[in-house]
Amino acid sequence: MLHVLASLPLLLLLVTSASTHAWSRPLWYQVGLDLQPWGCQPKSVEGCRGGLSCPGYWLGPGASRIYPVAAVMITTTMLMICRKILQGRRRSQATKGEHPQVTTEPCGPWKRRAPISDHTLLRGVLHMLDALLVHIEGHLRHLATQRQIQIKGTSTQSG
């Protein structure tokens, strides 16, 4: 439980938005890295048409946008917390000498059901992350077609 409390300030830093004067672009712009998967960086601010890479898009005044990376980090953190809780339950049952009872009734009480395996839990989280990435990709493609922004890897050859 102490690990969870220690990670709360980090989660709060990820969720809260910074001032627009301090960070007008995501962190990878500040350090000069090209980590954007959609790659729509304008040559200059004047050529910016309000796209994803424009200053102020990610952290605008009053905006509460959250980075997709932060969403994945929060999901991963929650998965780790759930895993620790499940491990603690299993350890406490093992020290008491109790074994989980398995019932064939689908509507039996929750305590009588077999515990969910780590494989099943991990599979569910991976499906959730996959759905999140598909949603982000669809949103970025929609923005690219809406604003005529060229996506990295696609070429517009004429002739």
Swiss-Prot record:
Keywords: Membrane, Signal, Transmembrane, Transmembrane helix. The gene is TMEM89. Residues 25-63 are extracellular. It is a single-pass type I membrane protein. The keyword Ribonucleoprotein does not apply. Residues 1-24 form the signal peptide. It comes from the Eukaryota. Residues 87-159 are cytoplasmic. It is found in: Membrane. The chain crosses the membrane at residues 64-86. Pfam families: TMEM89. Residues 91-110 are annotated as: Disordered. GO terms for cellular component: membrane; nucleus. This is Transmembrane protein 89.
